[in-house]
């Protein structure tokens, strides 16, 4: 298996934009990459305002929204609670099954979690349990300003304590007027966690196009570093199968 698990330090930090943009960029580079978000609350999968629809648009995958996200519900709560309140039972086994179905279509998947790693996800698992099953390297999406050092370092420590590899951090929503503080936070995160900050993605104000997002990702994220992970994972997978 290859790809990335995109998590964050909080909700509404920019995971979907980052996941969709990275998948779109790698697809432009010729990689057969898909996107997967097992559970979505706040919108049903077909809603154009929801994460599944935005992942589809940004990545450019042919996959239907309800295959990108097989379990979705409108109530904006932690997925486990939202599903429970709706009388729906979703297990870790269920979402791994759908993950494996997507792998029949793509060589690699960029998987988006929900909120942070300790979010109650399925009825029997947290987000981190799902990440541990997949064993994909993590990309941590974080806010760029006040409080982000603490949140990001804690997230990385929690991931490492659970045996996960963290490929890097992307600070999302960076404004030009705050860049001095953003750069200081970048340096502190790297020093305290030992994990590189691979990008400072700008703040997108108002409506934005797929092209604008992908061009920003190419300009502000170290795509070549992430490409090394994809290549290394593919090499390991090929070697293991021989």
UniProtKB/Swiss-Prot annotation:
InterPro entries: DTB_synth_BioD (IPR004472), P-loop_NTPase (IPR027417)
Superkingdom assignment: Bacteria
Residues bound to substrate: 41
UniProt-listed Enzyme Commission number(s): 6.3.3.3
GO cellular component, one term: cytosol
Principal place of residence: cytoplasm
Reactions catalysed, as given in the entry: (7R,8S)-7,8-diammoniononanoate + CO2 + ATP = (4R,5S)-dethiobiotin + ADP + phosphate + 3 H(+)
Positions annotated as active site in the UniProt record: 37
Pfam families per record: AAA_26 (PF13500)
Paired cysteines (S-S): none
Keyword tags: ATP-binding, Biotin biosynthesis, Cytoplasm, Ligase, Magnesium, Metal-binding, Nucleotide-binding
Principal EC category: ligase
An example molecular function term from Gene Ontology annotations: magnesium ion binding
Pathway membership: Cofactor biosynthesis; biotin biosynthesis; biotin from 7,8-diaminononanoate: step 1/2
Residues bound to ATP: 12-17, 51, 112-115
Location of this chain's protein in the cell: Cytoplasm
Any GO BP: biotin biosynthetic process
SUPFAM superfamilies membership: P-loop containing nucleoside triphosphate hydrolases
Subunit and partners: Homodimer.
Record-linked HAMAP family: BioD (MF_00336)
Free-text function comment from the UniProt entry: Catalyzes a mechanistically unusual reaction, the ATP-dependent insertion of CO2 between the N7 and N8 nitrogen atoms of 7,8-diaminopelargonic acid (DAPA, also called 7,8-diammoniononanoate) to form a ureido ring.
Similarity comment: family membership: Belongs to the dethiobiotin synthetase family.
Name this polypeptide is given: ATP-dependent dethiobiotin synthetase BioD
Organism: Bacillus thuringiensis subsp. konkukian (strain 97-27)
